[in-house]
Amino acid sequence: MEKYQAYLELLRRSRYQDILYPLFFRESIYGLAYGHESFFIENIDYNNKFSLLIVKRLSTRMYQQTNFILFANDSNKKTFGGYNYNFDSQIILEGFGVVVEILFSLQLFISSLRGLESVKSYKNLQSIHSIFPFFEDKLIYLNHKSDIRIPYPIHLEILVQXXXXXXXXXSFFHLIRFFFYYYSNGNSLFPPKKGISTFFSKRNLRIFLFLYNLYVWEYESIFLFLRNKSSQLQLKHFRVFFERIFFYEKIKHLVEISTKNCSYTLFFFKDTFIHYVRYQGKSILVLKNTPLLINKWKYYFIYLWQCYFDIWAGPETIYINQLSQYSFHFLGYFLSIPQNLSVVRSQMLKNSFLIKIVIXXXXXXXXXXXXXXXXXXXXXXXXXXXXXXXXXXXXXXXXXXLDRFLRICRNFSHYYNGSAKKKSFYQIKYILRFSCIKTLARKHKSTVRTFLKKLSSEKLLEEFFTEEDLFSLIFPRTSLTLRRFSRGRIWYLDILFRNDFVNHLEFKIGSDTF
């Protein structure tokens, strides 16, 4: 943290444009990249091979221009002159990521000094935990939904150019372009027959995550400009990601914008019932208006990707549905808005009336097939959604195996406790319980019935099932007691941290959807 502050102070006081270039050759930059105290991003694939001595030798060779060019030209070879260049390339890429993060941290710092702090404008930026209450409170009043799959750039150069306007150091920018140009010829970065989307799904290098997030933020900043129909962005945090003076030139392919009279040109965007949610490479646009407006937004997104980012995105990238007729997948849930018809008797003087009221409520159901596949991937159930004994957990201690199944069951309960229909929810918990019993019985080399008699099954029941689960097993489904419990919907604040297989759920469902 102190190192970051020191570099920020150095950049703030410096008047040279090429201050980022010498930072790239400092060993302490790579110490920040591979240290565990970075507050920018979680360190990925860290191991003890990245020592300061290796980085120092690498930076010494990089000072020599001939060796650096040879290193780039021979990036497809495992070794050259006794050095592992693929390994060195990974080190250099992490260094690029830290230097670029320092650059944008400096711009955020300068913006805060000028009174452009973005704390007040965070009222429209909410965490993932507020999405589920949003569905219950506001989604029922909207009628159209658009599923958007954010396309990947076809070439890494598009991502690099996104940082060109913000990078003041021309030498550093050309160095990044030079390195990517030669490094892309190697087999270790871009597979010849695979696209950049496959590359991003398998690689989590710091610099590529930053460039991709920069691309998404710039695309969303243009979307927010169109949404807010204003000549000045309301979310000041986006101002650091592109130059304002080039904005109207970039946007001219989408709509005709007049800088003097912008409100009349973008008057048709005025709609208070529009909401945008982005998660895991996809986004949802929901609004309450005619189908014409949401179809306009569909083609605005397509033209934006084609004209601004040179990304071909066909109409099949965006799906438009009515919320009252279709359900959609979101973070492992099936969400729908059914309309319930209720009859209210009203009496005025001697006359009585029957009034029919349509009540729309958000119904969130657990995806049983995807949840069973996620439990099978975690070796907690069989592929046919049946209880199975985990061979890996059988070799561990009995307390460790029980804790593992309890943790999975608890995470599953916390994540799906807000669902309206909990039949699938109870089925998965039933599978997890008996998978744990089978695993422990296999460890003790006995049958399930013998193991239950020996260990007392009531204790396992208390561990695996809450009071609500026990009522669902004891009372009939039509019981008033069960219906009283089933109406209770609780959203936990730590759902994304407690659920270990939410990413697998979304990948499984998303692969079928798009």
Curated annotation (Swiss-Prot):
GO molecular function, one term: RNA binding
Chief location category: plastid
Keywords of the record: Chloroplast, mRNA processing, Plastid, RNA-binding, tRNA processing
InterPro entries attached to this UniProt entry: Domain_X (IPR024937), Maturase_MatK (IPR002866), Maturase_MatK_N (IPR024942)
GO-annotated cellular components: chloroplast
Cell compartments where the protein resides: Plastid, Chloroplast
Recorded superkingdom: Eukaryota
Keyword Transmembrane helix among UniProt keywords: no
Biological processes, Gene Ontology terms: mRNA processing; RNA splicing; tRNA processing
Family membership: Belongs to the intron maturase 2 family. MatK subfamily.
Entry function: Usually encoded in the trnK tRNA gene intron. Probably assists in splicing its own and other chloroplast group II introns.
Identification of the protein by name: Maturase K
